[in-house]
């Protein structure tokens, strides 16, 4: 093949697509503003470098609504290192920097979500993939912005639900990942108006699981589970410029632990579906997991598991000579997960 082929990824004469050009311009302008380079200096530029200070607040701005979050990471632009085809001279592989792209944003947030964020997550679980614009904001103790990362056309890639554990005293947080088409780092823009409603902390021990026909009263632990988005890259303009197009959702298995003495209904289900081969849709079940307030009387969030099917049942390992409650682990496949807000 001719080494001067215009489609060669390392060709210096290759013209970037319009999307890539705008992305580069956005990265450069935003970076200049953020780090106080000439002609882009702002009063908050120096403070922007302190966004990782201990005790600073992290927030998500979504359609004008400012949402406090526990933590946020990623999103800053980076480039891949591209290897050129081997050449006899010089005797080592040449490398160059590829086009910039934005990293995924990873965010820990409260399971009891404000309206804008709840709708985004709910739509994603219903396979209604909506792209959002917004910003990730870092402030100091007084809610003065230290930095702002503006994102465009972001789509959710993962929704991670925390584990539920009766013996735990720790709070649980939802983990969200979303992929922006491009991001722009900016300096802070002043003081953030703090949300009027406070975020509700949810302890991991406050939950209620219900599966019709099964005794779930002694379920001591539900393992964390994550819904993942599959993507199909779509070329825009030149072959170097790709946009992620949402494909299908990958729903996880549901795994839980309960006392052996209360596992009889689960084992009967396991016998029917697995040992006797009654594995049709008529043997599947629907389950609900309710996240409860501190009084254990008000539902804050309901997670529904559709088309559950048991495929594994077995005792947990117990060390010899220990006086512990014997427990079993149960695993079920799940075809769809949805969420709905409670009344709390």
Specify the residue positions occupied by each region the protein language model found.
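N-terminal secretory signal peptides
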Residues: 1-20, 29, 35, 40-46
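Glycine-rich, low-complexity intrinsically disordered segments
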Residues: 48-344
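Flexible domain-boundary/linker segments
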Residues: 31, 38-39, 124, 273
């Amino acid at each position: 093949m001719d080494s001067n082929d215009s489609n060669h990824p390392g060709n210096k004469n290759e013209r970037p697509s319009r999307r890539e050009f705008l992305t580069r311009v956005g990265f450069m302008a935003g970076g200049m503003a953020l780090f106080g380079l000439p002609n882009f200096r702002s009063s908050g530029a120096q403070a922007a470098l302190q966004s990782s200070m201990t005790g600073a607040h992290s927030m998500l701005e979504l359609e004008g609504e400012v949402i406090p979050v526990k933590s946020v990471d990623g999103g800053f632009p980076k480039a891949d290192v591209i290897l050129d085809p081997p050449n006899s001279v010089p005797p080592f592989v040449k490398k160059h920097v590829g086009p910039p792209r934005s990293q995924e944003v990873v965010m820990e947030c409260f399971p009891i979500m404000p309206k804008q964020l709840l709708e985004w997550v709910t739509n994603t679980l219903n396979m209604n993939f909506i792209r959002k614009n917004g910003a990730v904001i870092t402030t100091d103790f007084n809610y003065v912005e230290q930095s702002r990362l503006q994102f465009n056309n972001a789509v959710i890639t993962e929704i991670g639900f925390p584990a539920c554990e009766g013996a735990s005293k720790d709070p649980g947080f939802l983990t969200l990942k979303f992929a922006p088409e491009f991001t722009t780092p900016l300096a802070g823009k002043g003081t953030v108006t703090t949300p009027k409603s406070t975020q509700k902390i949810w302890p991991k021990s406050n939950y209620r699981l219900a599966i019709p026909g099964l005794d779930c009263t002694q379920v001591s632990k539900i393992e964390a589970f994550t819904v993942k988005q599959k993507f199909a890259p779509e070329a825009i303009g030149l072959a170097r410029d790709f946009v992620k197009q949402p494909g299908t959702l990958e729903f996880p298995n549901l795994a839980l632990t309960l006392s052996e003495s209360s596992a009889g209904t689960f084992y009967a289900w396991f016998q029917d579906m697995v040992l006797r081969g009654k594995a049709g849709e008529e043997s599947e079940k629907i389950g609900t997991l309710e996240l409860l307030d501190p009084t254990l009387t008000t539902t804050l969030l309901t997670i529904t598991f559709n088309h559950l099917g048991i495929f594994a049942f077995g005792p947990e390992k117990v060390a010899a000579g220990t006086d512990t409650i014997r427990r079993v682990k149960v695993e079920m496949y799940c075809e769809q997960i949805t969420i709905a807000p409670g009344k709390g």
